[in-house]
């Protein structure tokens, strides 16, 4: 159910190239949370700017005001406006939106995040109460974010960087292969990040027969299916929109060659 609320920014801090905000969201989480991996739609500015879809890093049911944490990078006029807001300011927020990851609290998952695709995976880590493993990828060690939270909320955390300045030197799919060779008993691989990363992770998961779900949230534009930027082709010939039909899809259904 779509809820619109005026949300107060109660905390704001810089995380590498990203900005983290904690919002007081009224009853939004209690009324509309379905699964980790959903997003919110934030009005950015008072003019003709579209609302911007922002993935939810974590959410908490609290009376009287639920708490939402969002982590985002400045990628245009809308997110630049959002980055200029301060603690105490109020945002017009719609949420929680989209279809998140299909998962059980009792499950054990291999969580894979790349770059700004890392924050949505924190909600998955919290949802399973420390039973899951996280593999996090960044361009370099100084770009790493949220690693301490994952270490507190996961059974194990593995890190990869493109330049080798932190953790494994290389891409996350190599660590996914390494982990599944050691233990292929995960209920599923859940991933969020750039499309090439998702494709490679899905391929490795398929080789080990482990189900894989991918969040294609990086491709969202307007968040309401109007701009068509987030069209995603399926193997059955269907064309779906990440913001309306996703952002999470079964990796086996995605046409990775489209």
Segments (PLM) and residue ranges:
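Ferredoxin-reductase
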Residues: 2-87
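Short microdomains enriched in Cys/His and/or Lys/Arg
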Residues: 244-258
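Structural signal for conserved beta-strand scaffold positions within catalytic alpha/beta enzyme cores
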Residues: 11, 58, 159-161, 214, ...
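Short, surface-exposed secondary-structure boundary micro-motifs
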Residues: 45-46, 96, 235
């Amino acid at each position: 159910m779509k809820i619109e609320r005026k949300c107060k920014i109660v905390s704001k801090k810089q995380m590498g190239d990203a900005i983290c905000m904690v919002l007081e969201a009224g009853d939004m989480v209690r009324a509309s949370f379905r699964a980790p991996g959903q997003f919110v739609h934030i009005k950015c500015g008072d003019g003709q700017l579209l609302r911007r879809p922002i993935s939810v890093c974590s959410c908490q049911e609290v009376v009287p005001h639920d708490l939402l944490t969002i982590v985002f990078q400045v990628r245009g006029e809308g997110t630049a406006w959002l980055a200029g807001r301060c603690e105490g300011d109020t945002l017009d927020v719609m949420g929680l939106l989209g279809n998140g990851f299909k998962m059980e609290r009792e499950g054990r998952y291999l969580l894979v995040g790349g770059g700004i695709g890392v924050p949505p995976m924190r909600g998955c880590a919290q949802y399973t109460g420390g039973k899951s493993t996280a593999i996090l990828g960044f361009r370099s060690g100084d770009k790493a974010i949220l690693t301490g939270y994952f270490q507190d909320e996961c059974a194990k955390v593995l890190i990869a960087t493109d330049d080798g300045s932190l953790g494994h030197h290389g891409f996350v799919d190599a660590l996914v292969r390494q982990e599944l060779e050691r233990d292929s008993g995960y209920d599923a691989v859940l991933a969020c990040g750039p499309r090439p990363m998702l494709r490679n992770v899905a391929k490795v998961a398929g080789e080990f027969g482990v189900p894989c779900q991918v969040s294609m949230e990086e491709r969202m534009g307007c968040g309401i299916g109007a701009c068509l930027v987030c069209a995603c082709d399926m193997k059955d010939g269907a064309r779906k929109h990440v913001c309306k039909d996703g952002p999470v899809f079964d990796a086996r259904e995605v046409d990775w060659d489209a």
